[in-house]
Amino acid sequence: MLRLPSRIVFPFGYRISVRQISDTDMDRRDPNADGIWDDDAKTIYLRKRLPVTRRRYILAHELGHAWLDWQHRHLDNGKAKT
């Protein structure tokens, strides 16, 4: 079985942490969410109790949010060119 990564690195050294947290910790952030992208902390939080297939799906979804933030910082602000 493939494990979920604890860190992902986008181009230009944009590092993202992936944390699998308890229901209590997730509920403090957002009781209605199973996954959260925190742009300030550059961290994706996933609800640990969910089946791994569901966590993978949520990770992919949250990576989409992270990618858009990366794009805004590096492409839209002129740090990189397509």
What annotation goes with each model-predicted range?
Residues M1-P11, S17-T43, V52:
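Catalytic zinc-binding patch centered on the HExxH motif and its immediate surroundings
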Residues D30-A33, T43, V52-Y57, L68-T82:
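Post-HEXXH active-site segment of zinc metalloproteases
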Residues R47:
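Residue-level recognition of the GNAT/N-acetyltransferase active site
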Residues H61, H65:
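Histidine-centered divalent metal-coordination motifs
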